[in-house]
Amino acid sequence: DCPSDWSSYEGHCYRVFQQEMTWDDAEKFCTQQHTGGHLVSFRSSEEVDFLVSILKFDLFWMGWRDIWNERRLQWSDGTKVNYKAWSAEPECIVCRATDNQWLSTSCSKTHNVVCKF
C-alpha cells in the first residue's frame, strides 16, 4: 500500500511534484520523501504509460545520469576505453511525456520531479 498522495502501480509507489529543480536536488528530494525513494525509473512501456496518465506536465527527470561515463564503451578495434574526454558538464536524462522520448540534458538544468519507491 502506498501512502496518501502517492499512486500505486505494480508494487511501486509514485508521487508527482510540480516543482522544478536540478537533478542532484531532485534525487536528494526524492530520498527525503520516503525510505527507498529515488527519481523515477522504468522497467516497461506500460509503467511509462501509467505515469504519463497521472502527469500534468511534459518534462521530468529520470533517475539516470552520466549516461556516457557509465557506459562500458570500447573502441572499434575492441580495446577498452581508458581515456575519455567528454565535456565537463555531466548529462542527465529527462523524459518527455508527450511522446515518451528520453532526452540527454545538463544535470544543472531544472525540471519537474517524479519520485518512486
UniProtKB/Swiss-Prot annotation:
Intracellular or extracellular location(s): Secreted
Tissues expressing the protein: Expressed by the venom gland.
Principal location: secreted
SMART domains named among the record's database cross-references: CLECT
Family from the record: Belongs to the snaclec family.
Quaternary context: Heterodimer of subunits alpha and beta; disulfide-linked.
Name the record gives this protein: Snaclec CHH-B subunit beta
